Swiss-Prot record:
Organism, as annotated: Staphylococcus aureus (strain MSSA476)
Record keywords: Glyoxylate bypass, Magnesium, Manganese, Metal-binding, NADP, Oxidoreductase, Tricarboxylic acid cycle
Name of the protein: Isocitrate dehydrogenase [NADP]
Keyword Metal-binding assigned: yes
Pfam families: Iso_dh
Reaction(s) this enzyme catalyzes, per UniProt: D-threo-isocitrate + NADP(+) = 2-oxoglutarate + CO2 + NADPH
Organism lineage string: Bacteria, Bacillati, Bacillota, Bacilli, Bacillales
Known EC number: 1.1.1.42
Gene from which this protein is expressed: icd
């Protein structure tokens, strides 16, 4: 077998039997969790395909290790390698202190135009949870990754730049509601039609491909009408223009209510559901954050903007065990580029202690295997995690919250996962 690059074809990814996949080991606990995760991934691939498939891992540098080695936090060589090989896995990265790059994670997403942050959230039986029915949580979050207030267009209070911006807003645009202009910092919130459409398109296509029931557009369009309100409307418009015969939208529902009454609208939605159509609906963000606690089963795939998505994905993760078991991916569905990553931080006080839960980066690698079409290997890891947690052999974060648990190290947890691969 010869290791080869993954390429992007007209119908999606072309994945060889021995793909070369770059990885960033990460800072802090990164080496601990990556050593565990890579062993589990390799064992699952071997078990699933009897040696006919394997991954050749290629280390690239970012974060503290890159800075110590090259003097750069995010070397151009790393970006070029990921661009060339399309798919990568990464551990948590520290945020550089001082000027320049504000966040290495954001820089990677923007440089590679990874417009979707994919965050599936589900509960594994036995995982400690603060809610009564964590099993009702089964959502997939599509968070827009490149726009919104996280675009990084900010001007610090007191600078020449912010004074120019405020002067322009007040004197050219007639903005009178900057309450304290002399001491305000300013951030810009870009939300585009193109950015919205490619995110919502990916979310709806995912729902169709994975037999999901609905896509909820989460927004604050009631307040921010020309950014978040436009996101909602562009999302609905895209759903009908590109997926018209496969979806039923709440805007269609409202039109039927107006013309024929609510009974007719309810009947139309029930008919659409029976036909397997995806229901496209929307929710104001603050109401949505209540509903994921009070009735999470009503939501399935979620499409939302950058800031809302950040809050929602971590709030949901808390309901099913925390970010230690929350997978994540950053994907450009058009170019094929994707980075699969641990969703937690570097936890430097635990670095090198062989103590923390490696499940986030392992489950993110499950997303990668699914993305490659290697479903058999992905399922083996997921099933093993379910069985291992159910047997109460867990790392310290779960052991302290479970009766009768056996606390094990990071590496021993990986050993247990490998043992339980079926």
């Amino acid at each position: 077998m010869t290791a080869e690059k993954i390429t992007q074809g007209t119908e999606g990814l072309n994945v060889p039997n021995e793909p070369i996949i770059p990885f960033i080991i990460g800072d802090g606990i990164g080496p601990d969790i990556w050593k565990a995760a890579s062993r589990v991934i390799d064992a699952a691939v071997e078990k699933a395909y009897n040696g006919e498939k394997r991954i050749e891992w290629k280390e690239v540098l970012a974060g503290q290790k890159a800075f110590d080695t090259t003097g750069e936090w995010l070397p151009q060589e790393t970006l070029d390698t990921i661009k060339e090989y399309l798919i990568a896995v990464k551990g948590p990265l520290t945020t550089p202190i001082g000027g320049g790059i504000r966040s290495l994670n954001v820089a990677l997403r923007q440089e590679l135009d990874l417009f979707t942050c994919l965050r599936p959230v589900r509960w594994f039986k036995g995982v400690p949870s603060p809610v009564k029915r964590p099993q009702d949580v089964d959502m997939v979050i599509f968070r827009e990754n490149t726009e919104d207030i996280y675009a990084g267009i900010e001007f610090k209070e007191g600078t020449t730049e912010v004074k120019k911006v405020i002067d322009f807003l007040q004197n050219e645009m007639g903005a009178t509601n900057i309450r304290f202009p002399e001491t305000s910092g300013i951030g810009i919130k870009p939300v585009s039609k193109e950015g919205t459409e490619r995110l919502v398109r990916a979310a709806i296509q995912y729902a169709i491909d994975n037999n999901r029931k609905s896509v909820t557009l989460v927004h604050k369009g009631n307040i921010m009408k020309f950014t978040e309100g436009s996101f909602k409307q562009w999302g609905y418009d895209l759903a009908l223009s590109e997926f018209g015969d496969q979806v039923f939208t709440w805007q269609q529902y409202d039109e039927i209510v107006e013309k024929e009454g609510r009974d007719a609208a309810n009947a139309a939605q029930e008919k659409a559901e029976k036909e397997g159509k995806i229901i496209i609906k929307d929710s104001i963000a603050d109401i949505f954050l209540q509903q994921i606690l009070t009735r999470p089963a009503e939501h399935d795939v979620v499409a939302t903007m950058n800031l809302n998505g950040d809050y929602i994905s971590d709030a949901l993760a808390a309901q099913v065990g925390g970010i230690g078991i929350a997978p994540g991916a950053n994907i450009n569905y058009e170019t094929g580029h994707a980075i699969f990553e641990a969703t937690h931080g570097t936890a430097p006080k635990y670095a090198g202690l062989n103590k923390v839960n490696p499940s986030s980066v392992i489950l993110s690698s499950v997303l990668m295997l699914e993305h490659l079409g290697w479903q058999e290997a992905a399922d083996k890891i997921t099933d093993s995690i379910e069985d291992t947690i159910a047997s109460k052999v867990v790392t310290y974060d779960f052991a302290r919250l479970m009766d009768g648990a056996e606390e094990v190290s990071t590496s021993a947890f990986a050993d247990e996962l490998i043992k339980n691969l079926k």
